[in-house]
Amino acid sequence: MSKRLLLFDFDETYFKHNTNEEDLSHLREMEKLLEKLTNNNEVITAVLTGSTFQSVMDKMDQVNMTFKPLHIFSDLSSKMFTWNNGEYVESETYKKKVLSEPFLFEDIEDILRHISAQYNVEFIPQRAFEGNETHYNFYFHSTGNHNNDSRILEALVRYANDQNYTARFSRSNPLAGDPENAYDIDFTPSNAGKLYATQFLMRKYNIPVKSILGFGDSGNDEAYLSYLEHAYLMSNSRDEALKQKFRLTKYPYYQGITLHVKEFVEGKYDY
């Protein structure tokens, strides 16, 4: 039997913020299933997230997660970490591919200043940036008019592209700690992002798209979920537009993942 690839967004997908006592039994059931499938050499697991690697580790510790996904692609999949001999190790191969083109914070600041001046708006850093980052993320608070928001953000993406930079935007998720009525603005190298990470794993393990199952809950999952034949938006998602586009999990969070992973590996989605 050929291996299957299981891909998970992290915040509000693989990890529920505000996990309570009732959720823990469902979490343990999910981990038990993933551990069994991994030990039986049936699946490869990977987390694709916009969060930093340390943030993922801290959140896993909060709920005492014991299962270790083989790969964690952090910082909007601009960094790759692999579980090896009891610890996560960053992939130098992936890093070289990501940093094959210039990616400078000074250039990104210039791009944001240009759009800020043109539309009289502000972009707020989401965290303190360090040197040589591969992911710079900002908040943009809604103007109160969706069409106006889209006009500004699409202008940002176009202008960034003109400067040979990749910018993405999606609705912020308050359940994951984001502010209400805001957008995430993400800058990454061109060789990064959840879709890029997905295709990297497909090549690495020679896995066809029909053998991949993906889960997500928000706008930065849209591109990679759209690429897959077997993709689920979490039923707990707050993105109403995406709910119209993707199949929803039967249950939220851990229960939903467990059910659909079981069905997937049992061949119920094969055709």
Swiss-Prot record:
Record's keyword annotation contains Hydrolase: yes
One MF annotation (Gene Ontology) recorded for this entry: magnesium ion binding
InterPro entries registered for this protein in UniProt: HAD-like_sf, HAD-SF_hydro_IIB, HAD_sf, SPP-like_dom
Pfam families membership: S6PP
Listed GO CC annotations: cytosol
Keywords: Hydrolase
EC number of the protein: 3.-.-.-
Gene3D superfamilies in alphabetical order: HAD superfamily/HAD-like, yhjk (haloacid dehalogenase-like hydrolase protein) domain
NCBIfam families assigned: HAD-SF-IIB (TIGR01484)
Sequence similarity: Belongs to the HAD-like hydrolase superfamily.
Name of protein: Uncharacterized hydrolase SAOUHSC_02465
